[in-house]
Amino acid sequence: MSERGLLIVFSGPSGVGKGTVRQEIFSTPDHKFDYSVSMTTRPQRPGEVDGVDYFFRTREEFEALIKEGQMLEYAEYVGNYYGTPLSYVNETLDKGIDVFLEIEVQGALQVKSKVPDGVFIFLTPPDLEELEERLVGRGTDSPEVIAQRIERAKEEIALMREYDYAVVNDQVSLAAERVKRVIEAEHYRVDRVIGRYTNMVKETDKKLS
């Protein structure tokens, strides 16, 4: 039976570049984990693909899934729901495959309460001025929404202490490499591998007895 995979939870403030860094991580063949596509009720942006970037659903559809207990986590952010479908995550982890979640901070804290042995990585901007420039440059939000996102970012950065690692996104390729190193190191933690070696000793003792 395969060992259960790692749940990798990757989040940070809106506009910090989570999606761009995630795409960089998955653009190379050396990653060994699956990406769990999040679900949202926000409008689909130009270039985004349903089922690849997000599962785009109506508010009514999303709320029905919540009532049915089909979401690992969910949060409402700037008037839209974001969340993670539960079935895909459990099925993949049970196969021994790592699952990479790119989710909002609220959702990450929900996951931590349910899966405390996950790997929680917070992506942070070099500073708030650069974060604001990125939000403005994206050209998808009004000045009022951008102001809301900046205030929310301040609150979320204060929650960084709830995470295991903080990675600064000063350059996309470097940030992606840092995240991959964190994940690789997690596979060698003693508390994650001790069971394997304990069983190895027991099996050897049985053969010798």
From Swiss-Prot:
Alphabetized InterPro entries for the sequence: GK/Ca_channel_bsu, Guanylate_kin-like_dom, Guanylate_kinase, Guanylate_kinase_CS, P-loop_NTPase
PROSITE patterns per record: GUANYLATE_KINASE_1, GUANYLATE_KINASE_2
Entry's Gene Ontology molecular function annotations: ATP binding; guanylate kinase activity
Catalytic activity, as annotated: GMP + ATP = GDP + ADP
Cytoplasm found in the keyword field: yes
Pfam families: Guanylate_kin (PF00625)
UniProt keyword Disulfide bond, yes or no: no
Assigned EC number: 2.7.4.8
Chain residues that bind ATP: 12-19
Subcellular location: Cytoplasm
Name of the featured protein: Guanylate kinase
Domain Guanylate kinase-like positions: 5-184
Keywords from the UniProt entry: ATP-binding, Cytoplasm, Kinase, Nucleotide-binding, Transferase
Record function comment: Essential for recycling GMP and indirectly, cGMP.
Cited HAMAP family: Guanylate_kinase (MF_00328)
Protein family membership: Belongs to the guanylate kinase family.
